[in-house]
């Protein structure tokens, strides 16, 4: 790694306190020293963001509570879309993962009041990781969000891209008595359903300002439907010519003669979707958030704070995928009748008597998180002391999955020749997609019952001491922090067998008329498919006599999916803040000792992995030490021009799932993957510099450059390995994906930001970021969009406020799936909001989110091989806000 430079910090304590005060009083008019009257409302809150950035020692961007309230969003991630260098992933229609300066979301940290909060995901295919799920955080909690693009020694380590610190409201920072609330209705035009939203906050403190209480509650419910086209892995054309592991063709060449046979012989490596069809995903998301804060200030220097936060969220969902499956070995009776290949891709293939599948999965998914935090702060003239501690627990995942699989054999054609604009067409000789009687379960394997819960726990304590000085040395701070983190998942299931029942027995119905609206190239068969009733399916399965109980030893994939990670972290730091004339900044270092314990089930070598005795619980322990120096310098070149430079050495620990002993195999398609407990942390030398021109009141034009030299970069690698295949009953070859420290990577780029409040109530925010991230041999880095841009014009005058937000990001790599390089195509998003303040205390807001119903297009290797193409619908939100 590079030199041990010294890195940068963030906003000074005075700047942060000033920003907090302004954020809480943005509805009042203020007069700065030069006598200019500052506008109120949203324009004032933007001015506070500029002010916080200007006064900071480090490269930082802030979003105030007024910003969050004005954005047409459902979570905090959406409010960060206008921060230069920040991109958001919206697979399910709203921001859930945040990338900073071209780095993987797992390489960024999100803190709540400077601390890690336990959280969990709901999706059955997700594993516990370090990525924070922003969908869990209610915007009403937020006072301010600070995005640190360069670290300070005093701030928790673990981020290469940047650190997001979410600061919540405190009663002693508000007016003596505050009552605020909102009541609204959120409607999704794709699901054609809506529900009531509500939030309330009450804050009080005594006249002396020595004791205060705050309590808040929020209910958010989103009834979404995601329509899509999906494929599951890729196969090569020689799969149909007897080149698979069994030595026989999954589908016989059949009537593939003449030109078809010639094409097949000449293009053995041409790729084609292993399976392709339509997806129907329906979900009711409900999040209940409760919070309370008490503050006591018995003397001027001492402040004691206690915080409580609880989140209860449900994500029950019904997923129904209906697809042709030409790559399945059950197709021995099928035949290939036609084939078209273009530039290494099978663009069209026709089959006779080949397999189709309807997978119906009803999942009970939920997340609960509870955090207790205590803080004692003493702030004297010459010194200050901070003592903090807390406990944060979360559980989530899929508590129950009921899965039935229905099979059909028919003649069909899969045509992806129009991709990416026309992702694909599935055509049948007879319309089985609209015929529930044509699909039935197979008694040999009819489905399964699965539960896959997860846990996440955090324990922490810290002590910080600061000494204040006159002269160039302003403050010397040092401290100690201890963190204990535990995360893991359980995985149990049981196969359902002996069922022979048609799909028509489960209260089927045609999809709504708007199903797959906005997808080019689909046909009436796809748009008119049927769906089953989830409750009917669940009642049928759970009503079966002698229903087996899910077990972690029922199959290898379940056993291998049980793992646990424990992590103990101790940190010491020292930091000096300095100021001399036009020069200011900080210099410091952080020493960190990390000890990890990775445990999970591993199959004994040579065993069939189909009995409890074949498995052992294996624990791997490792530890490492890091010294992380940092320096930050800010120079006021002139009154309205500031130059900043930062250098640092940072680490990011491996994702929890990557560190585990987790291992899985898919016997039918010959793929698998798992974790690697011997992974080393990412290590990076970072350089940042910026030039900020405050050319007018409430205006900024800024340019920023960044360079990250990352070592021990972790990437998924795929290798061919042999394991016992329970489906085949013999040892076969699998494509196995595992994480490895693949070597080095570099991320470099620049960002340009412009913000200005214009005359007559108008204003604009705009930014562009270029981030070029490459690993060894030019490998793409996960979630690195080379280009990102956003534009947000606004108008605010009197009781009226209008705003539009446009964001765009270029394509990005997401990882390896079943041996394929996975990408997401470039996408754009448009949101608008309009507010009318009926009185000073009461306002009405209308918001439109995802107005273009943007398409999420994931693909394998090339855009001509779609993997998942989705639309989540537009959202309309009407809200009445009160604030007294």
Question: What spans do the regions from the language model cover?
Answer:
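Repeated loop/turn-to-beta-strand initiation elements of outer-membrane beta-barrel proteins
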Residues: 210-211, 301-304, 382-385, 473-476, ...
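Outer-membrane beta-barrel signature, preferentially recognizing the C-terminal barrel domain
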Residues: 354-369, 557, 561-568, 622, ...
């Amino acid at each position: 790694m590079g030199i041990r430079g010294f890195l940068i910090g963030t906003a000074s304590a005075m700047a942060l306190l000033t920003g907090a005060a302004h954020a809480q009083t943005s509805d009042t008019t203020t007069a700065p020293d030069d006598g200019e009257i500052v506008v109120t409302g949203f324009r004032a809150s933007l001015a506070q963001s500029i002010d916080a950035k200007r006064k900071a020692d480090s490269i930082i961007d802030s979003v105030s509570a007024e910003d969050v309230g004005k954005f047409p969003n459902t979570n905090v991630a959406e409010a960060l879309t206008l921060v230069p260098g920040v991109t958001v992933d919206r697979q399910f229609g709203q921001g859930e993962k945040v990338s900073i300066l071209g780095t993987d979301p797992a390489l960024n940290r999100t803190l709540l009041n400077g601390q890690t909060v336990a959280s969990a995901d709901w999706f059955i295919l997700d594993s516990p990781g370090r990525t924070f799920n922003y969908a869990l955080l209610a915007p009403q909690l937020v006072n301010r969000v600070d995005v640190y693009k360069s670290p300070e020694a005093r701030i928790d380590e673990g981020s290469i891209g940047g650190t997001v610190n979410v600061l919540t409201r405190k009663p002693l920072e508000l007016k003596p008595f505050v009552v605020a609330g909102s009541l609204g209705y959120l409607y999704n035009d794709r699901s054609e359903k809506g529900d009531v939203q509500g939030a309330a906050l009450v804050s009080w403190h005594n006249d002396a300002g020595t004791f205060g209480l705050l309590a808040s509650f929020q209910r958010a419910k989103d009834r979404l439907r995601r329509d899509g086209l999906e494929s599951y892995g890729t196969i090569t054309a020689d799969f149909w010519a007897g080149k698979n592991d069994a030595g026989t063709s999954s589908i016989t060449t059949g009537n593939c003669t003449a030109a078809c046979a010639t094409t097949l012989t000449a293009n053995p490596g041409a790729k084609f979707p292993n399976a392709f069809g339509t997806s129907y995903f329906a979900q009711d998301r409900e999040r209940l958030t409760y919070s309370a804060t008490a503050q006591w200030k018995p003397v001027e220097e001492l402040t004691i704070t206690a915080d409580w936060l609880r989140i209860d969220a449900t994500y029950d969902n019904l997923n129904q995928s209906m697809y042709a499956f030409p790559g399945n070995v059950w197709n021995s009776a099928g035949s290939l009748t036609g084939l078209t290949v273009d530039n290494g891709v099978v663009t069209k293939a026709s089959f006779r008597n080949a397999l189709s599948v309807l997978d119906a999965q009803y999942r009970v998914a939920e997340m609960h998180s509870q955090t207790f935090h205590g803080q004692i702060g003493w702030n004297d003239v010459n010194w200050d002391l901070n003592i903090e501690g807390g406990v944060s627990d979360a559980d989530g995942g899929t508590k129950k999955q009921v899965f039935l699989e229905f099979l059909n054999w028919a003649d069909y054609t899969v045509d992806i020749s129009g991709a990416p604009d026309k992702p694909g067409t599935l055509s049948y000789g007879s319309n089985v997609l609209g015929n529930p009687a044509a699909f039935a379960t197979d008694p040999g394997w009819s489905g399964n019952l699965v539960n896959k819960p997860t846990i996440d726990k955090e324990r922490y304590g810290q002590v910080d001491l600061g000494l204040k000085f006159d002269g160039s040395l302003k403050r010397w701070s040092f401290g100690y922090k201890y963190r204990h983190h535990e995360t893991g998942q359980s995985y149990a299931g049981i196969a359902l067998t002996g069922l022979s029942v048609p799909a028509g027995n489960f209260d089927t119905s045609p999809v709504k008329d708007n199903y797959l609206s906005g997808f080019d190239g689909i046909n009436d068969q796809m748009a008119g498919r049927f769906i089953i009733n989830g409750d009917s399916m669940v009642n049928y399965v759970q009503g079966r006599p002698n229903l087996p109980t899910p077990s972690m030893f029922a199959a290898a994939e379940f056993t291998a999916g049980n793992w646990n990670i424990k992590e103990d972290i101790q940190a010491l730091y020292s930091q000096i803040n300095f100021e001399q004339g036009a020069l200011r900044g900080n210099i410091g270092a952080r020493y960190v000792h990390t000890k990890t314990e990775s445990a999970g089930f591993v199959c004994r070598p040579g065993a069939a992995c189909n009995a409890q005795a074949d498995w052992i619980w294996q624990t791997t322990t490792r530890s490492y030490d890091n010294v992380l120096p940092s320096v930050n310098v800010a120079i006021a070149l002139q009154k309205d021009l500031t130059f900043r430079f930062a250098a640092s050495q940072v680490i990011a620990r491996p994702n929890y799932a990557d560190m585990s002993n987790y291992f899985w195999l898919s016997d039918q398609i010959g793929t698998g993957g798992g974790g690697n407990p011997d992974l080393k942390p990412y290590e990076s030398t970072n350089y940042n510099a910026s030039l900020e021109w405050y050319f007018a009141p409430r205006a900024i034009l800024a340019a920023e450059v960044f360079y990250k030299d990352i070592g021990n970069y972790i990437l998924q690698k795929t290798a061919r390995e042999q394991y016992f295949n329970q489906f085949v009953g013999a040892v076969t070859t699998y494509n196995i994906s595992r994480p490895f420290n693949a070597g080095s990577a570099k991320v470099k780029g620049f960002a340009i930001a412009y913000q200005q409040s214009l005359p007559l109530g108008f204003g604009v925010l705009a930014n562009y970021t270029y981030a070029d991230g490459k690993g060894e041999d030019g490998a793409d880095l996960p979630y690195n969009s080379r280009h990102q841009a956003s534009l947000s014009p606004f108008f605010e005058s009197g009781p009226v406020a209008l705003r539009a937000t446009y964001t765009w990001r270029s394509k990005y790599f997401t990882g390896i799936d079943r041996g394929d390089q996975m990408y997401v195509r470039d996408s754009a998003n448009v949101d608008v909001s309009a507010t009318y303040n009926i009185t000073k205390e009461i306002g009405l807001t209308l918001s439109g989110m995802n107005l273009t119903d943007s398409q999420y297009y994931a693909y394998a290797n090339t855009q001509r091989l779609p993997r998942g193409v989705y639309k989540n619908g537009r959202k309309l939100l009407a809200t009445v806000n009160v604030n007294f």
